[in-house]
Amino acid sequence: MKMKGLWLACCALVLSGAEAMACTGLLVGKKASTDGSVMISYAADSHNLYGEMYHWPAANWPKGATLDVVEWDTGKPLGTIAQVEHTYNVVGNMNEHQLAITESTFGGRRELHNPEGIMDYGSLIYITLQRAKTAREAIKVMTDLVAEYGYYSGGETFSIADKQEAWVMEMIGKGAGRKGAVWVAIRIPDDCISAHANQSRIQQIPFNDKENCIYSPDVVSFAREMGFFKGKDADFSFQQAYCPYDFSALRGCEARVWSFFREYDSTMDQYTDFIKGDASKKPMPLYIKPNRKLSVQDVQKGMRNHYEGTDLDMTKDAGAGSYKVPYRWRPMTFKVDGQEYTN
């Protein structure tokens, strides 16, 4: 879909709980694209998902109207919230003002899941699209909703974009009995590209850059309270505090970001050991300045990436079979003689 300045690719928008960890999102700033548009993408990469295109027509609502919130993944009723007076027209993951929101689930620390929360990540996306016009307004709507009604889901990375700006926001709950969430949102520079793929990506937070960074007031203090962080504010990493790396996070998630980045930055091979599972190595940046501008077709190609041209090329390993097929059946891991392998 191409509309005046924001381009969004969406596919496989119905997620089961097991497949929520199979999403990839790419972001392109307006000065990093060939036509000056902001671009984001969204896909849940699995053979057993079926795509849907949602539509909420614009509407006016009477004073005192309410809205039932149903978990997007499962259809479970979560609660009721106040409705606003007017809601915008939404098709898929974009509204009439060309605000678009997508996500990838990183999960994070299990003890931070709040089973009493009302706002799950899917409802948060689609309700916000009905209520906000810009990316900055969307961030406020989303964070206000979880503060008032509680956050039900695990950790999420959201792509939030309008015709002018692209943002990455990461959010995780506070655990049972504690309403709200801790979160941080960082604007992607106009001349840069970013990506996320089911692993928290925000490291140090530029606390003094109020124009390009927004965060919950307790994002650091809550981590200290929970024993997740003990250092100085300047050394705080959202990822390290709320979603520590493991092998799957690097090999299965950060590797997807790396394979996209390396198409536009010749220095990315310095992170090869990192994405192969060595968490002691320096992590990749949240965004990079590409060596050339990206077109819509480049983003489409990035979403079809199978690590071609790298040691991880999925058409060349044992799982590809005799026909060199890059696709893998779920689950992605299997055990032989007690040893676990990734397919």
Predicted regions and their residues:
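Sec/Tat signal peptide C-region and signal peptidase I cleavage site
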Residues: 16-22
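Sec-dependent N-terminal signal peptides
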Residues: 5-15
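Substrate-recognition/cap regions that form aromatic- and gly/pro-loop-enriched pockets
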Residues: 320-343
